[in-house]
Structure formats: C-alpha cells, structure tokens
C-alpha cells in the first residue's frame, strides 16, 4: 500500500504528454500530425484511463484503511524561507480524481465524434488533456501555492475552451467575460493566501490548520483580519463555482463546444470552487462568520439560479443555470457544516449533469441536420419538440438525467439533495424554506426543458393547426399559453411563434437548411462505427452515432447506481461515510451513522411531493393541449379577460422578464460597472495625456515660442543682445530695490 501512495505523484502528469506531443507535432510535422489525428484521441483516453484505474485503487485502500498520505519535497532558499512541493492523497483527493477521470474519459470518447468535422480537432484534444492535468494537479496539491498555480492553469484551459471558436465574436466575448470575472475572484484568492501566510508562516495545509487552531484557541489573532482573509479565499471559490454575484460568466460559457460544457460543469472548473472550500473546511469552521457567509451565498445562488433557468430558450443555457443552482446547494451544505452531504451531491450531480449535457449535445448535433450550423437555432428549444420518435435513446437518457436532478428516487441526485434539504432544517428554517421551494422550481424548469425538447411536434416543420381562429394573429409564449395579438414584431420576450390564417408557418423561413460541407464529410472517429454519417440533408433529426451514445449509456448506469454509495444497508455504515472517515459534520456531531428509516421516509415523501408538484405544473403548461397546437378552441374557451387574469398575466410576465433578462444583473454590471470603468479609463486617459503630459509639454512649447520671439527681436546683432541684457538687469535691480525698500 505504501508503494502505491509513493507513485501517486504521477497522477497529474500522465495526461500531459498528449498536449506536449500534439504541440511539437503541429510545429515540426504538421501534415503527419493532422493525418494521424485519430491516434491522439486514443492516447488521451488511454492515459486518462490509467489515471482512473490508479485513482480507484487508491480509493479502495482508503475505504478499507481510512489512510491519508502526504509527501513533500523541500526547496530551501535560505535559513528563513523555503518552498515545499508535494502531493496529498486523502478521501477528498480520491473522490475528485475519480470524478475527473471517469467524466473526462467519457467526454473524450464523445468528443471524438462530436468534433470530428472541426478543423481544431487536435487543438481541442490538446486543451482537454491539459485541462485534465491541471485539475488533477489541483486536487493532489499539498499546499496553497500549488493550489494557486494549478487553479490558474485550470482557469486558463477553461478560457481556451470557452473561446475555442474564437472567430465567432460571441465566443470571444464569452471567453473575455469569463476571464475578467474570474480575475476578481482569483485576485481575492491570492490576497487571502498571502494573508494566512502572514498569520501562520506556512502554506502547507497540515501546518496551516494546526498553527491557526493554536492561535485561535490562545486568542492571538485579530478576528476582523482573519475573517477578511477567509472571505478573500472564499472569493476565489465564488468566481470559480459561479456563485452570486460572480456567476455571470457561466451562461455565456456555453459558447464553447458542448463536450467541454459537460466537463466544466460536471467535474472540473466549477467543481474546483467546491473542492477549495472543502479542502479549507478545517480553517473555516473555527471562523463562525465565514461559515454563515458561505451558507448565505449558497442559498442566494440556489434560488437565483433556479429562477433564472425558468424562461431560457437555449437548452445549454438552461442547463448552465441549473448547474449554478445545484452548486449553490453544495455551497449551502458546506456552509452548514454538512461536509458529507456536499461531497455526496458533488458526486451525484456530476454524473447526472454530464448525462444531461451530453444528451443536449446529441440533440444539437441532430438538429444541425435541419438548421445547419447555427447555435441560435440548433440550441433553441422553441424550434425543437417532437424529438421522441427521432432520437429515442437520447430522449430516454435525457429523461433519466432530468428525473435525477428533479430528485425522483431511486436516481442519484435524490439521495444527496434529500440529505442537504433535511440538514437545512437543522441549520435555519428560513434557509430550509428557500431550499425546499427551489427543489420544486428545479423540477419545474428541468421538466420544462425536457418537454420543450422532446414532446409535442417538431416545430421547425410546424404546419398550420386545424380549427377555426377567432383572430388573424396569435402568439404562443414560452410559458405555453396563448398570448394576445401582437403588432410589434421586434418584441423579443413574448413573441415566439406567429401564425397567420390559412398559411403555412415557419419560425424563420420555409426552406430546409443544408448541412455544411465539412459536417457531411466527416472523418471517422477512432472507434469504428459502420454506416456512420448521412450524406444527404434530412427533413428530420436522426439519432447520434454510437460513439456519442456509448458515453451517454455509461452515464445512465452511474446516474442509476452512484446514489447507493450513500445508502445505509442493514444499519451498517455506508460506503461514502467509510470513504470520508474522518469527516466533518457540525450538524450531526453525536451521530452514530445509523439511519431512522421512518424519518427518512417522511422527508423523502415530502421532497418527492414538492418535485412532483413542479413536474405537474410543467406538464400542465407545456404538455399536449398547449404545445401541440391542436385544439386552440379549447384553450380559447378557458381564456377570459378579467382583472384577475390581467393581474396573473402581469405576474407571469414579470417573472418571465426577470428570468429571460438574467435577473437584470448583467445589465446592472454593464450599466454601472462596465460603463463606469470605461468612463474612468477615458477620464484617466484624458488626464494623463492632457494634464500630466500637457504640463511639461506646455512648458517646453512655451519656452520654444519665447525663445523664437526673443531671437527674432535680437536680429542677430551683438549690440541688440547687450541692450536687452542691460535692460533686463536694470529691471531686476529696480524690482529688487523696491522690494527691499
């Protein structure tokens, strides 16, 4: 066992040869490297698989022995200062390593087909492998300096992948937005690290925790300064895990390829913030105010993310806000001191969300056969619908992921989210009420995404409905109800579909978009699949290739069974509790790790009832009678203009505007922060050029003109110079005489 731990340092470096060799190959032998590009995908999967096997072996040993291993190399600069580098293997490290490798392998296999048509195929796999290296280095770090180095590398890789299609202005802006937003958090993280080094004199986790606890117990620290440093450390996690108020980069990060959306949102970048807070939990728990602050940020993010997901049209953006909300649950659990529940939800959510993102990628891939490569159309749920019979495997997998995130047993997220919801009652009834209400919202918006995507009719080919219309112009709002007659065609928040009497209707035009040439002539992926690729444009979507479906099917297995890690069987300690021993739990300090099945069943029925209510509301608004457009006469019979209905419409539109406009937070930042910074920069530029540079330049210019005037008056004659000389001397003497008189 000791020998296994001694070689654990190799974990972060195994995937590293792939990006290095791809880079050298493209520089030295570009033609040969590109012609053998399938080989690089295979190598990426192979090396990450070796890391996965090694991580699983370490995890099994930790479950059996609850061991923690740390190895440190010391680089002594002088007698007073030395740098130490090493690796730390504990339950948190092994959990994160397994998450990163399992999700990473499946995303790489999926990407081989998804990115096969892209000219940046090799660049994509180089970024992905380096991303895995950076994240594995982060979770195995033994001190804050290493954490910060790999933290920045993880951020760099995510920026490169978000802006992967950098020729698209939207993707370039999204990359810039992610970079600037994370700079705020990363700067706070750096200041916090330096602050705690100033307090304790150490970057190593063990020494840091021990010294700091001694200082706290002896009351030898300034609590205000300590709290400030802790808030700065937490600021890095706020930005990385897209917590309020630094969450604004996450929805725009969907501009990157869909596979990287799955990896970033499931097991890498956004999970890094949760990992950091979990790693520093022994530091935070002795600072009560920071724990309260963490839980406050978590509960705000939980509710905000859910409300912003309610009316999104882009399928990936809706899932992004869902990720934000679920990360809020994890942060809430950490703030409450429920360490096990937070990590449990991190595990279950990672696989469920990866399943949903890869499923959405399969849908987008199939929609591109109809609308061409246009993210505004291929990702628009309003143009989807009726995909059940065209992509049945994707549909069923997406349904399982949806039900898991809704909290329906026995799927993965039910077990972990239920723990957090139950613990919230022990912490704060107000927080618990918000958390439970958000569980219903989660069920609503996830079911809404599923229904808009797969149920009803394929809206790209929507034919006119049968039945008599009472007015010549209708609009079907995103909420699923018939709207009033609309005259302003540019009103974006309500008008989603306009139908004229006895006319065939389409969202954009009545032509079928052709697939781009480089999409049709795809290069075969490294897994050989027979009869791959359609050579003709289809009028309907078709199921994705087996190479894309294989990772989805594996994620279904994880979604079905990974939740059983945290279930108590026969009153024994569950696997997750044994894995995390010793664990931190401020809410169950005297717990004997047994479970009261009556209490569990009562809480489970309550949570499932709330989720079922959200699902029912979503079905009521989006299922058949509204979404199929087959019986508008029945709808019209229920629609009565009354003051009560007008009031409800106002509430509905206000909620819709709030959600669709991202809570106006982006607009606030754009108006006050971005515009203010631009004006400040313009003023600074003006002050620098006109005032700072203007004064010496003005003095020099004035001296030049005075010299020119004097030179012209003198005329070049010595007698004139002598005359002016004696005149100025006389004037000076007179002034001096009268001043001293």
Swiss-Prot record:
Query: One of this protein's GO BP terms?
Result: ATP synthesis coupled electron transport
The record's InterPro entries line, in alphabetical order, gives: NADH_UbQ_OxRdtase_chlpt_su5_C (IPR002128), NADHpl_OxRdtase_5_subgr (IPR018393), ND/Mrp_TM (IPR001750), NU5C-like (IPR003945), Proton_antipo_N (IPR001516)
Cell compartments where the protein resides: Plastid, Chloroplast thylakoid membrane
Membrane topology per record: Multi-pass membrane protein
Intrachain disulfide bonds: none
Q: Which GO terms describe its cellular component?
A: chloroplast thylakoid membrane
Which parts pass through the membrane? 9-29, 40-60, 89-109, 125-145, 147-167, 185-205, 219-239, 258-278, 283-303, 327-347, 354-374, 396-416, 425-445, 549-569, 605-625, 721-741
Q: Could you tell me what this protein does?
A: NDH shuttles electrons from NAD(P)H:plastoquinone, via FMN and iron-sulfur (Fe-S) centers, to quinones in the photosynthetic chain and possibly in a chloroplast respiratory chain. The immediate electron acceptor for the enzyme in this species is believed to be plastoquinone. Couples the redox reaction to proton translocation, and thus conserves the redox energy in a proton gradient.
Q: What is this protein called?
A: NAD(P)H-quinone oxidoreductase subunit 5, chloroplastic
Give the species this sequence originates from: Pentatrichia integra (Rock-climbing daisy)
């Amino acid at each position: 066992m000791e020998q296994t731990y001694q070689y654990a340092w190799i974990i972060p470096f195994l995937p590293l040869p792939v990006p290095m060799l791809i880079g050298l190959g493209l520089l030295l032998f570009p033609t040969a490297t590109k012609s053998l590009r399938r080989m690089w995908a295979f190598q990426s999967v192979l090396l990450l698989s070796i890391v996965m096997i090694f991580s699983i072996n370490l995890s099994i040993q930790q479950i059996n022995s609850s061991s923690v291993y740390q190895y440190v190399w010391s680089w002594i600069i002088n007698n007073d200062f030395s740098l130490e580098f090493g690796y730390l293997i504990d339950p948190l490290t092994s959990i994160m390593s397994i998450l990163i490798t399992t999700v990473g392998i499946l995303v790489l296999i999926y990407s081989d087909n998804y990115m096969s048509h892209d000219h940046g195929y090799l660049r994509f796999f180089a970024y992905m492998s380096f991303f895995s290296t950076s994240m594995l280095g982060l979770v195995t770090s033994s001190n804050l300096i290493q954490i910060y180095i790999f933290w920045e590398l993880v951020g760099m890789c995510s920026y490169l992948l978000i802006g992967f299609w950098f020729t698209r202005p939207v993707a370039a802006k999204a990359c810039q937005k992610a970079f600037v937003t994370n700079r705020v958090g990363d700067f706070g993280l750096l200041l916090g690290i330096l602050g705690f080094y100033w307090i304790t004199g150490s970057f190593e986790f063990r020494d840091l925790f021990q010294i700091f606890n001694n200082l706290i117990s002896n009351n030898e620290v300034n609590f205000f300064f300590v709290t400030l440093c802790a808030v700065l450390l937490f600021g890095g996690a706020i930005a990385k895990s897209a917590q309020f108020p630094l969450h604004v980069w996450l929805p725009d990060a969907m501009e990157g390829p869909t596979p990287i959306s799955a990896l970033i949102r499931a097991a890498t970048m956004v999970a890094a913030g949760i990992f950091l807070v979990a790693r520093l939990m022994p530091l935070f728990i002795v600072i009560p105010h920071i724990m309260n602050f963490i839980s406050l940020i978590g509960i705000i993010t939980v509710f905000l993310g859910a409300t912003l997901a309610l009316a999104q049209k882009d399928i990936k953006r809706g899932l992004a806000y869902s990720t934000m909300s679920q990360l809020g649950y994890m942060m809430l659990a950490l703030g409450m001191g429920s360490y096990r529940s937070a990590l449990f939800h991190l595990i279950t959510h990672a696989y469920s969300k990866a399943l949903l993102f890869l499923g959405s990628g399969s849908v987008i891939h199939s929609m591109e056969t109809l609308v061409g490569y246009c993210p505004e159309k291929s990702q628009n749920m309003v143009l989807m619908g009726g995909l059940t019979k065209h992509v049945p495997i994707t549909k069923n997998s997406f349904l399982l992921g949806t039900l898991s995130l809704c909290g329906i047993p026995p799927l993965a997220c039910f077990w972990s989210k239920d723990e957090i919801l139950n613990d919230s009652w022990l912490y704060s009834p107000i927080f618990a009420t918000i958390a439970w209400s958000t569980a219903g919202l989660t069920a609503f918006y996830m079911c809404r995404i599923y229904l808009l995507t797969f149920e009803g009719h394929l809206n790209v080919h929507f034919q006119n409905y049968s039945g008599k219309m009472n007015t010549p112009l209708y609009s079907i709002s995103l909420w699923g109800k018939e709207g009033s007659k609309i005259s302003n065609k540019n009103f974006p928040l309500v008008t989603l579909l306009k139908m004229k009497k006895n006319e065939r209707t389409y969202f954009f035009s009545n032509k079928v978009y052709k697939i781009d040439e480089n999409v049709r002539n795809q290069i075969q992926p490294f897994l050989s699949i027979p009869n791959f690729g359609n050579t003709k444009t289809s009028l309907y979507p078709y199921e994705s290739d087996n190479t894309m479906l294989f990772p989805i099917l594996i994620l279904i297995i994880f979604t079905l069974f990974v939740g059983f890690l945290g279930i108590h069987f026969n009153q024994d300690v569950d696997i997750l509790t044994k894995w995390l021993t010793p664990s931190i739990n401020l809410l169950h300090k005297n717990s004997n790790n047994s479970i009261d099945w009556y209490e569990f069943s009562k809480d489970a029925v309550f949570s499932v009832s709330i989720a079922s209510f959200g699902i029912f509301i979503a079905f009521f608004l989006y299922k058949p009678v509204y979404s199929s457009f087959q019986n508008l006469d029945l709808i019209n019979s229920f629609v009565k203009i009354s003051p009560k209905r007008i009031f409800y419409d106002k509430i509905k539109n206000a909620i819709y505007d709030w959600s669709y406009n991202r809570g106006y937070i982006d607009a606030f930042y754009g108006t006050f922060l971005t515009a203010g910074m631009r004006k400040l920069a313009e003023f600074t530029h003006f002050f620098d050029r006109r005032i700072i540079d203007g004064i010496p330049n003005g003095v020099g210019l004035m001296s030049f003109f005075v010299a020119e005037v004097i030179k012209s008056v003198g005329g070049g004659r010595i007698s004139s110079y002598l005359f002016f000389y004696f005149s100025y001397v006389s004037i000076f003497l007179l002034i001096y005489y009268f001043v001293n008189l």
